[in-house]
Amino acid sequence: DERHKYAIMDPNLVPKYAVLDPKLTVSMPKFVTATTGIDALTHAVESYVTWAYNNNASNRNAEEAVVKIFRNLKRAYEDGNDLEAREAMLIASYKAGLAFNHTGVGYVHAIAHAMGGIYNTAHGLANAVIMPIVLEDYGTAVHPQLAHLAEITGVKTTGSDAEKANAFIAAIRQMNREMGLPT
């Protein structure tokens, strides 16, 4: 048993339509809500900080996704019947998908895929643990992007790019803690 996890991509796999019905998500367990929400956040953040292939459209989709996730993930986690939060999370996930479909993802997903293949770690859980570490490791290269995300989410609107970037990473860790995910 080789224990590999592979991504498959083909234009024939792209649906023509997507139905985003929040009622279909209300029965999701809290753990699944938390980890799939963090996976969507990872898609958006990785798309936003990548230098390869990003453009105004992918950045706009990533920004919209990050803002919606910061505003709604904890609400959806705490009250699975909150259809407004659930709908916002569906739209955020969709927008994050549009963003990373154009740009790709980065080291967080590379590591998370390996962990899933080797250790059967839930993908979103691996992302939750790894994302803050990888974002810190990227250092100053991503401070401007993370600073902007801190500003638009209201995490931190004053200070240097480094201070805002670090506050954004800390906010991700706090979100994880509040949903019972390891940090």
What is each PLM-predicted segment?
Residues 44, 48, 72, 114, ...:
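Amphipathic alpha-helical segments in well-ordered regions
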Residues 118-183:
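Gly/Pro-rich interdomain helix-loop hinge
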Residues 2-103:
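Carboxylate- and glycine-rich phosphate/diphosphate-binding segment that chelates Mg2+/Mn2+
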